[in-house]
Amino acid sequence: MASQDCHMLLSFFISTFLITVVTSQTRCRNFKSIISFGDSITDTGNLLGLSSPNDLPESAFPPYGETFFHHPSGRFSDGRLIIDFIAEFLGIPHVPPFYGSKNGNFEKGVNFAVGGATALECSVLEEKGTHCSQSNISLGNQLKSFKESLPYLCGSSSPDCRDMIENAFILIGEIGGNDYNFPLFDRKNIEEVKELVPLVITTISSAISELVDMGARTFLVPGNFPLGCSVAYLTLYETPNKEEYNPLTGCLTWLNDFSVYHNEQLQAELKRLRNLYPHVNIIYGDYYNTLLRLMQEPSKFGLMDRPLPACCGLGGPYNFTFSIKCGSKGVEYCSDPSKYVNWDGIHMTEAAYKWISEGVLTGPYAIPPFNWSCLDSKIKNNESLHTQYSLMNS
C-alpha cells in the first residue's frame, strides 16, 4: 500500500513538473508581430484613413502628434499610444493602420482599431435606444476585415496565416467604452447602460474564441478606464454635490463604480476562457487601476498636482467644452503635456499612456503577469523599464 502511495506521489510530482515546464514555455514568447483591434485608445491612423478630406477627425490637425511625431499622425493624443509603447518594448516597429494604407508593410503588425468603434454592432445599440453612427467600424467588422485580409497579410503560400497569428501579440481593446459613451453622453439612466455590459462582454469573448480557433496564443485584453475621471464626463455631469466626487482624485464615484462593474464582468469571462483554453495566454490589462494610480499620486510620476484638467481644450473648470474641441481653430494646448494626464478631455497624454503601458507590461497591473524571461537581453536590461517598474510597484 505504501509502495502504491509512493508511486502515485511520484507520478503526481512528475505530472506537476511537466505541466510547469509546458506552462513556462507557453507563457513566454518572442513575438514577431502585433495584431490589434479597438477604438481611439489604440487607433494609429485608421479613422483618418477612412475619412473623407472634407470630414477629417480632430486627430488630423495640430496639436495632435506634436510631442513625438511633431505632426498629426491620426493618433488621438499628443504623441504615442499604449500600443506604440508595447511595440517599442517588444522591439517591433510601430503598428501601422490597416484602413487607408496603400501598399502598407504589415510584416511586423497590423492595427484594425478605429476611433469611435464599438464592441456591439450599431443595430444592437439602436435596438437598445442608443444612437450609433452608421460609419462605425465595430469589433465584429474589424475582425471580418482581418480575416478577409489574411491572404494579403501572409501571401498565397499561407492563406490562413496560422504561423503569424500564433506568434503574434494580440491586443483586443480597450473596447466597449464607446458602447457606454453614446448612451451616457445622452444622459441615459446608468441602469439602462448596465444592460449593455453582458452584451459587450459576450462580444469580446466571441472575438477571442474566433482568434483562438485561428491559432492565436497570446492576448492582452484591457478593461475600461475609470470613466468618472474623464474630463468629458466631469464636465457633462458637473454637480455642486461634493458627495458624488472622490475626495482624493476628484473623480465621479458613480461612474467609476460602473467601470468597475464592467471590468469585473470582463475578468470573470476571461477566467472562464482561460479554463476553456489552457494552452492560451489570456491576460487582463488593468487600465483602470493604473490610471487611478496616476490620479492618486501624480507628483510621484512627474505629473502636476492637479491632474484632471485637459492639456488641450478651452473653457470650464476642466479646460474642456463639447462644442469647441482640441484641434479646432483657436484652441490652445499646454506648454508641457508631460505634466498632464488628460490630453483633450477624452484621451490621455503620451506621458500617461507610457505609465499605463509600463504598469501593465512590467508592473503589477496585468492578470496574470507577463513572463518576459525569454525576451532579448537588450529588452530585459532596459534601465528605464526597471525604473518605471519600481515606481509602479512602490
UniProtKB/Swiss-Prot annotation:
This protein's GO CC annotations: extracellular region
Keyword vocabulary terms for this entry: Glycoprotein, Hydrolase, Lipid degradation, Lipid metabolism, Secreted, Signal
One MF term in the entry's GO annotations: hydrolase activity, acting on ester bonds
Active-site residues from the entry: 40, 344, 347
Chief location: secreted
Keyword Signal in annotation: yes
Record-listed E.C. numbers: 3.1.1.-
Location relative to the cell: Secreted
Family: Belongs to the 'GDSL' lipolytic enzyme family.
Name of the featured protein: GDSL esterase/lipase At2g27360
